[in-house]
């Protein structure tokens, strides 16, 4: 069963283990359903982390791939150029 982990790579490895287990076909139905639910939950968590990372990169890089300058007084928002 999936456990709460903060590390993206660990969660991705756990999801891969679940997929491998389910693909083997040697899992009782009830266990397969539990594993599937855990996999869906992990998949959603990973997707959220990827979306968050993508948004962070978008804030730091303009459409041409150049780094944006951050306003030191408001480090979370890039300066307008």
From Swiss-Prot:
Class of this enzyme: hydrolase
GO process annotations (BP): DNA catabolic process
Basic and acidic residues composition-biased segments: 60-70
Any one GO MF annotation of this record: exodeoxyribonuclease VII activity
Transmembrane segments: none
Catalysed reactions listed for this entry: Exonucleolytic cleavage in either 5'- to 3'- or 3'- to 5'-direction to yield nucleoside 5'-phosphates
Nuclease among keywords: yes
Enzyme Commission code: 3.1.11.6
Compositionally biased spans, kind Polar residues: 71-81
Protein family (similarity comment): Belongs to the XseB family.
PANTHER family: EXODEOXYRIBONUCLEASE 7 SMALL SUBUNIT
Protein purpose: Bidirectionally degrades single-stranded DNA into large acid-insoluble oligonucleotides, which are then degraded further into small acid-soluble oligonucleotides.
HAMAP family given in the database record: Exonuc_7_S
Protein name per UniProt: Exodeoxyribonuclease 7 small subunit
Gene label: xseB
């Amino acid at each position: 069963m999936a456990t709460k982990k903060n590390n993206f790579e660990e969660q991705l490895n756990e999801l891969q283990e679940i997929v491998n287990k389910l693909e083997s076909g040697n899992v009782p139905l009830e266990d397969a359903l539990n594993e599937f639910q855990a996999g869906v939950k992990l998949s959603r968590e990973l997707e959220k982390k990827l979306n968050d990372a993508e948004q962070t990169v978008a804030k730091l890089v303009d459409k041409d791939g150049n780094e944006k300058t951050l306003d030191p007084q408001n480090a979370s928002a890039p300066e307008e150029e």
